[in-house]
Amino acid sequence: MEAFTIHTGRAVPLRRSDVDTDQIIPSEWLKRIERTGFGAGLFAQWRADDGFVLNEPAYAAASILLAGSDFGTGSSREHAVWALQDYGFRAVLSPRFADIFRGNALGNGLLPVQLSAETVEALTSAVEADPTIEITVDLVAREVRGAGLVATFDLDDFTRWRLMEGLDDVGLTLRHEDMITSFEAGRPAWSPTTA
Protein backbone atom coordinates (compact mmCIF):
# COMPACT_ATOMS: atom_id res chain seq x y z
CA MET A 1 0.00 0.00 0.00
CA GLU A 2 1.31 3.44 -0.90
CA ALA A 3 2.06 5.65 2.09
CA PHE A 4 -0.02 8.79 2.53
CA THR A 5 1.45 11.81 4.28
CA ILE A 6 0.68 14.99 2.33
CA HIS A 7 -1.04 15.08 -1.03
CA THR A 8 -1.64 18.12 -3.20
CA GLY A 9 -3.75 17.89 -6.32
CA ARG A 10 -6.68 19.13 -8.30
CA ALA A 11 -10.20 18.11 -7.36
CA VAL A 12 -13.38 16.92 -9.06
CA PRO A 13 -16.64 18.41 -7.74
CA LEU A 14 -19.21 15.58 -7.59
CA ARG A 15 -22.43 17.36 -6.60
CA ARG A 16 -24.29 14.23 -5.61
CA SER A 17 -25.31 12.92 -2.22
CA ASP A 18 -26.12 9.34 -1.22
CA VAL A 19 -23.71 7.88 -3.78
CA ASP A 20 -23.75 4.13 -3.18
CA THR A 21 -21.14 1.55 -4.05
CA ASP A 22 -23.18 0.25 -7.00
CA GLN A 23 -23.01 3.73 -8.53
CA ILE A 24 -19.29 3.95 -7.80
CA ILE A 25 -18.57 0.60 -9.47
CA PRO A 26 -21.47 -1.31 -11.09
CA SER A 27 -21.89 -4.98 -10.21
CA GLU A 28 -20.82 -6.24 -13.66
CA TRP A 29 -17.28 -5.10 -12.77
CA LEU A 30 -17.12 -7.32 -9.67
CA LYS A 31 -16.18 -10.45 -11.60
CA ARG A 32 -12.54 -9.41 -11.90
CA ILE A 33 -10.09 -11.12 -9.56
CA GLU A 34 -7.26 -8.59 -9.68
CA ARG A 35 -7.25 -5.29 -7.79
CA THR A 36 -6.37 -3.17 -10.82
CA GLY A 37 -8.23 -2.17 -13.95
CA PHE A 38 -11.32 -0.88 -12.16
CA GLY A 39 -10.79 2.77 -13.10
CA ALA A 40 -12.63 2.25 -16.39
CA GLY A 41 -15.70 1.14 -14.44
CA LEU A 42 -15.72 4.05 -12.00
CA PHE A 43 -19.15 5.73 -12.17
CA ALA A 44 -19.63 3.80 -15.45
CA GLN A 45 -23.34 4.49 -15.77
CA TRP A 46 -22.92 8.20 -15.14
CA ARG A 47 -19.89 8.47 -17.41
CA ALA A 48 -22.07 7.34 -20.32
CA ASP A 49 -23.50 10.88 -20.12
CA ASP A 50 -21.10 13.23 -21.93
CA GLY A 51 -22.01 16.00 -19.48
CA PHE A 52 -20.88 14.04 -16.41
CA VAL A 53 -18.17 15.88 -14.48
CA LEU A 54 -15.50 13.16 -14.90
CA ASN A 55 -15.85 13.54 -18.68
CA GLU A 56 -14.91 17.22 -18.54
CA PRO A 57 -11.29 17.77 -19.69
CA ALA A 58 -10.75 20.40 -16.98
CA TYR A 59 -10.93 17.67 -14.32
CA ALA A 60 -8.92 15.00 -16.17
CA ALA A 61 -5.90 15.08 -13.86
CA ALA A 62 -7.79 15.39 -10.57
CA SER A 63 -6.69 13.24 -7.64
CA ILE A 64 -9.14 14.45 -4.98
CA LEU A 65 -12.88 13.83 -5.11
CA LEU A 66 -15.25 16.36 -3.52
CA ALA A 67 -18.45 14.46 -2.80
CA GLY A 68 -21.84 15.09 -1.29
CA SER A 69 -23.02 13.66 1.99
CA ASP A 70 -23.38 9.92 2.64
CA PHE A 71 -20.74 8.83 0.15
CA GLY A 72 -20.18 5.09 -0.23
CA THR A 73 -23.50 3.80 1.10
CA GLY A 74 -24.84 0.41 0.07
CA SER A 75 -23.05 -2.91 0.09
CA SER A 76 -19.54 -3.49 1.34
CA ARG A 77 -17.55 -3.40 -1.86
CA GLU A 78 -13.78 -2.98 -1.76
CA HIS A 79 -14.00 -2.74 -5.54
CA ALA A 80 -15.45 0.77 -5.06
CA VAL A 81 -12.26 1.84 -3.30
CA TRP A 82 -10.09 0.08 -5.88
CA ALA A 83 -11.97 1.85 -8.71
CA LEU A 84 -11.43 5.27 -7.13
CA GLN A 85 -7.74 4.53 -6.61
CA ASP A 86 -7.26 3.03 -10.06
CA TYR A 87 -8.78 6.15 -11.57
CA GLY A 88 -6.18 8.22 -9.71
CA PHE A 89 -7.93 9.46 -6.57
CA ARG A 90 -5.91 9.61 -3.35
CA ALA A 91 -8.57 11.21 -1.14
CA VAL A 92 -12.32 11.77 -0.99
CA LEU A 93 -13.70 14.78 0.90
CA SER A 94 -17.31 14.58 2.07
CA PRO A 95 -19.53 15.71 4.95
CA ARG A 96 -20.31 12.07 5.78
CA PHE A 97 -19.25 8.57 4.70
CA ALA A 98 -20.89 5.19 5.09
CA ASP A 99 -19.01 3.35 7.85
CA ILE A 100 -18.23 0.27 5.76
CA PHE A 101 -16.92 2.33 2.84
CA ARG A 102 -14.81 4.40 5.24
CA GLY A 103 -13.28 1.23 6.71
CA ASN A 104 -12.57 -0.25 3.27
CA ALA A 105 -11.02 3.02 2.11
CA LEU A 106 -8.73 3.34 5.12
CA GLY A 107 -7.72 -0.33 4.83
CA ASN A 108 -6.66 0.20 1.22
CA GLY A 109 -4.89 3.55 1.46
CA LEU A 110 -7.63 5.85 0.12
CA LEU A 111 -8.13 8.70 2.61
CA PRO A 112 -11.78 9.54 3.34
CA VAL A 113 -11.77 13.02 4.90
CA GLN A 114 -14.91 14.09 6.71
CA LEU A 115 -15.38 17.87 6.71
CA SER A 116 -18.32 20.12 7.47
CA ALA A 117 -20.91 20.49 4.72
CA GLU A 118 -20.04 24.19 4.57
CA THR A 119 -16.35 23.47 3.96
CA VAL A 120 -17.06 20.89 1.26
CA GLU A 121 -19.49 23.32 -0.39
CA ALA A 122 -16.93 26.15 -0.31
CA LEU A 123 -14.24 23.91 -1.85
CA THR A 124 -16.68 22.58 -4.45
CA SER A 125 -17.76 26.08 -5.47
CA ALA A 126 -14.14 27.23 -5.70
CA VAL A 127 -13.15 24.26 -7.87
CA GLU A 128 -16.16 24.75 -10.13
CA ALA A 129 -15.14 28.39 -10.59
CA ASP A 130 -11.49 27.48 -11.22
CA PRO A 131 -10.66 23.81 -11.94
CA THR A 132 -6.92 24.55 -11.66
CA ILE A 133 -7.17 25.22 -7.91
CA GLU A 134 -5.10 22.75 -5.94
CA ILE A 135 -6.13 21.31 -2.60
CA THR A 136 -3.70 19.89 -0.06
CA VAL A 137 -4.73 17.00 2.15
CA ASP A 138 -2.19 16.94 4.96
CA LEU A 139 -2.46 13.78 7.05
CA VAL A 140 0.53 14.80 9.16
CA ALA A 141 -1.23 17.97 10.36
CA ARG A 142 -4.76 16.55 9.87
CA GLU A 143 -5.64 19.53 7.70
CA VAL A 144 -7.16 20.29 4.32
CA ARG A 145 -5.95 23.50 2.67
CA GLY A 146 -7.16 25.12 -0.51
CA ALA A 147 -9.06 28.04 -1.99
CA GLY A 148 -8.04 30.17 1.00
CA LEU A 149 -9.53 27.68 3.46
CA VAL A 150 -7.89 25.64 6.20
CA ALA A 151 -9.99 22.91 7.80
CA THR A 152 -8.98 20.27 10.32
CA PHE A 153 -10.24 16.70 10.33
CA ASP A 154 -10.23 13.84 12.81
CA LEU A 155 -8.56 10.48 12.38
CA ASP A 156 -7.43 8.16 15.16
CA ASP A 157 -3.69 7.93 15.79
CA PHE A 158 -3.33 4.25 14.89
CA THR A 159 -5.07 4.53 11.52
CA ARG A 160 -3.17 7.73 10.76
CA TRP A 161 0.14 5.95 11.55
CA ARG A 162 -0.80 2.97 9.35
CA LEU A 163 -1.59 5.25 6.40
CA MET A 164 1.59 7.27 6.87
CA GLU A 165 3.61 4.04 6.97
CA GLY A 166 1.74 2.54 4.02
CA LEU A 167 0.62 -0.49 6.02
CA ASP A 168 -2.46 -2.49 5.10
CA ASP A 169 -3.41 -5.55 7.20
CA VAL A 170 -0.87 -7.76 5.42
CA GLY A 171 1.90 -5.18 5.73
CA LEU A 172 1.14 -4.73 9.41
CA THR A 173 1.30 -8.50 9.95
CA LEU A 174 4.58 -8.80 8.04
CA ARG A 175 6.17 -6.33 10.45
CA HIS A 176 6.08 -9.27 12.88
CA GLU A 177 7.38 -11.87 10.44
CA ASP A 178 10.34 -12.79 12.68
CA MET A 179 8.02 -13.46 15.61
CA ILE A 180 5.68 -15.51 13.41
CA THR A 181 8.58 -17.56 12.02
CA SER A 182 9.93 -18.15 15.53
CA PHE A 183 6.52 -19.24 16.77
CA GLU A 184 6.05 -21.62 13.84
CA ALA A 185 9.54 -23.11 14.37
CA GLY A 186 8.67 -23.97 17.97
CA ARG A 187 5.42 -25.74 17.20
CA PRO A 188 5.23 -29.55 17.17
CA ALA A 189 5.74 -31.12 13.74
CA TRP A 190 2.24 -32.62 13.79
CA SER A 191 0.59 -29.17 14.14
CA PRO A 192 -0.68 -27.33 11.06
CA THR A 193 1.69 -24.66 9.76
CA THR A 194 1.38 -21.49 7.74
CA ALA A 195 4.06 -22.63 5.27
From Swiss-Prot:
Pathway: Amino-acid biosynthesis; L-leucine biosynthesis; L-leucine from 3-methyl-2-oxobutanoate: step 2/4. Pfam families: Aconitase_C. It is an enzyme of class 4 (lyase). Its EC number is 4.2.1.33. GO terms for cellular component: 3-isopropylmalate dehydratase complex. CDD domains: IPMI_Swivel. GO terms for molecular function: 3-isopropylmalate dehydratase activity. Keywords: Amino-acid biosynthesis, Branched-chain amino acid biosynthesis, Leucine biosynthesis, Lyase. It catalyses: (2R,3S)-3-isopropylmalate = (2S)-2-isopropylmalate. GO terms for biological process: L-leucine biosynthetic process. NCBIfam families: leuD (TIGR00171), PRK01641.1 (NF002458). Catalyzes the isomerization between 2-isopropylmalate and 3-isopropylmalate, via the formation of 2-isopropylmaleate. Heterodimer of LeuC and LeuD. Belongs to the LeuD family. LeuD type 1 subfamily. This is 3-isopropylmalate dehydratase small subunit. It comes from Frankia casuarinae (strain DSM 45818 / CECT 9043 / HFP020203 / CcI3). The lineage of its organism: Bacteria, Bacillati, Actinomycetota, Actinomycetes, Frankiales.
